[in-house]
């Protein structure tokens, strides 16, 4: 009799994806972030579901309902902070996952990479809409500023913004539709993640060397299941420490003030994980130019396979590219810092230089470094 996990139609899929999957024997801890993202998504869907049971998407009661969750619902405060800080952990894992893909050349798996970029976009949209729901000052003004960017689109811009708002300003209709979208999108993310995995399992995983590992595979279980469990324990430990000891560390104090359309906060800024893109947006004086730069800052990832000039897939044996990669990381950290600063000297010029550096590194310097390294191989 054959084993049930190899014969049952559903178990067979699970078996081929998580148990008998042939995996490279040398993948490092940088390959843990895929499973961690899955755990983050499940955690966000569960905590979000329990929050939605008590939340009301009406401008008059939204802020009060969040206060009610934190004060009156059994363990409501922990559910709320798990959800808010879970989003931060989600984005930390996302950035590490994308960074790993860039460093080790995983973007040569075209379908997997492109679906990954779509996943990044959808996740960012979901997080943005979720940030609007508590209806604090930063929720309201963040929604106003970001949706208003669409008015930069020629001819149809203003109509588009009013269509998204459901009126002439961010109001009840906006909040209700954002809640509806924020509820449905995580399930779309889950579906896309399955397609992402489907395409990945067509080719098999990449590995740190960037060389085919067909000659040296090991089963996913028990080797990588135990490794993923260790990663999950560390993720939950960090999240628990954050939730229990510093729940508001990554939040904005302005969001503890109910939304007031008549009073603009001194510094409007998004959550920390959007600050790098926000800094790029602000560094261009022209509205439409800023919006295009903002979109391109993420969309540029789709160009990565076309910008790959090296004969080697991974950066493991490419010291010049390695240096440029870490300069890019430093540049993104600089942009994140600038995004949270007021628009004044010297922050404006630092932001502009960091934005130019970001596009220059990806579009020019890294492809040139790849070509130089190819020539150095001939020596």
Swiss-Prot record:
Q: Which parts of the sequence bind heme b b566? A: 97, 196
Q: Which gene encodes it?
A: MT-CYB
State the annotated membrane topology for this chain.
Answer: Multi-pass membrane protein
Gene Ontology biological process terms, A to Z: mitochondrial electron transport, ubiquinol to cytochrome c
Q: Which residues bind a ubiquinone?
A: 201
As for subcellular location, the record says: Mitochondrion inner membrane
Belongs to which family? Belongs to the cytochrome b family.
Q: What's the protein name? A: Cytochrome b
Known cofactor(s): heme b
Q: What else is known?
A: Heme 1 (or BL or b562) is low-potential and absorbs at about 562 nm, and heme 2 (or BH or b566) is high-potential and absorbs at about 566 nm.
Q: Which UniProt keywords apply?
A: Electron transport, Heme, Iron, Membrane, Metal-binding, Mitochondrion, Mitochondrion inner membrane, Respiratory chain, Transmembrane, Transmembrane helix, Transport, Ubiquinone
Query: What's in the GO CC field?
Result: mitochondrial inner membrane; respiratory chain complex III
Q: Which amino acids does the record list as binding heme b b562? A: 83, 182
Subunit: The cytochrome bc1 complex contains 11 subunits: 3 respiratory subunits (MT-CYB, CYC1 and UQCRFS1), 2 core proteins (UQCRC1 and UQCRC2) and 6 low-molecular weight proteins (UQCRH/QCR6, UQCRB/QCR7, UQCRQ/QCR8, UQCR10/QCR9, UQCR11/QCR10 and a cleavage product of UQCRFS1). This cytochrome bc1 complex then forms a dimer.
Q: Does the keyword Transmembrane apply?
A: yes
Q: Which PANTHER family match?
A: CYTOCHROME B
**Principal localisation:** mitochondrion
GO MF, any single term: metal ion binding
Q: What is the lineage of its organism?
A: Eukaryota, Metazoa, Chordata, Craniata, Vertebrata
Q: Which residues cross the membrane?
A: 33-53, 77-98, 113-133, 178-198, 226-246, 288-308, 320-340, 347-367
> Organism source for this protein?
Neotragus moschatus
- Give the cofactor note text: Binds 2 heme b groups non-covalently.
> Which function does this protein serve?
Component of the ubiquinol-cytochrome c reductase complex (complex III or cytochrome b-c1 complex) that is part of the mitochondrial respiratory chain. The b-c1 complex mediates electron transfer from ubiquinol to cytochrome c. Contributes to the generation of a proton gradient across the mitochondrial membrane that is then used for ATP synthesis.
């Amino acid at each position: 009799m054959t084993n049930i996990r190899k014969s049952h139609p559903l178990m067979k899929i699970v078996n081929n994806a998580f148990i008998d999957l042939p995996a490279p024997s040398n993948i490092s801890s940088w390959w843990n972030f895929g499973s961690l993202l899955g755990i983050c998504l499940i955690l966000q869907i569960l905590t979000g579901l329990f929050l939605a049971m008590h939340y009301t998407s009406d401008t008059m009661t939204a802020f009060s309902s969040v206060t009610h969750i934190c004060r009156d619902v059994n363990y409501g405060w922990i559910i709320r902070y798990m959800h808010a800080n879970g989003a931060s952990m989600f984005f930390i894992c996302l950035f590490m996952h994308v960074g790993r893909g860039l460093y080790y050349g995983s973007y040569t798996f075209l379908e997997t990479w492109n679906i990954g970029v779509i996943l990044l976009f959808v996740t960012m949209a979901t997080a943005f809409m979720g940030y609007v729901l508590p209806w604090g000052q930063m929720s309201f003004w963040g929604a106003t500023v970001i949706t208003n960017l669409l008015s930069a689109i020629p001819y149809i811009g203003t109509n588009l913004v009013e269509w998204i708002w459901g009126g002439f300003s961010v109001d009840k209709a906006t909040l209700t539709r954002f809640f509806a979208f924020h509820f449905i999108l995580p399930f779309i993310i889950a579906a896309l993640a399955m397609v992402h995995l489907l395409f990945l399992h067509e080719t098999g995983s990449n590995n740190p060397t960037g060389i085919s590992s067909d000659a040296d595979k090991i089963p996913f279980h028990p080797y990588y299941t135990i490794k993923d469990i260790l990663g999950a324990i560390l993720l939950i430990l960090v999240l628990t420490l954050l939730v229990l000891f510093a729940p508001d560390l990554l939040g904005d104090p302005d969001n503890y003030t109910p939304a007031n359309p008549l009073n603009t906060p001194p510094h409007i800024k998004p959550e920390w994980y959007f600050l790098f893109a926000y800094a790029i947006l602000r560094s261009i004086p022209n509205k439409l130019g800023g919006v295009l730069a903002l979109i391109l800052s993420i969309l540029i990832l789709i160009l990565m396979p076309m910008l790959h000039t090296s004969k080697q897939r991974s950066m493991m044996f490419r010291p010049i590219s390695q240096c440029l990669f870490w300069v890019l990381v430093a540049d993104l950290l600089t942009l994140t810092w600038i995004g949270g600063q007021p628009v004044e000297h010297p922050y404006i010029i630092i932001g502009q230089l960091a934005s130019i550096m970001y596009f220059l590194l990806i579009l020019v310097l890294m492809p040139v470094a790849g070509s130089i390294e190819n020539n150095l191989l001939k020596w």
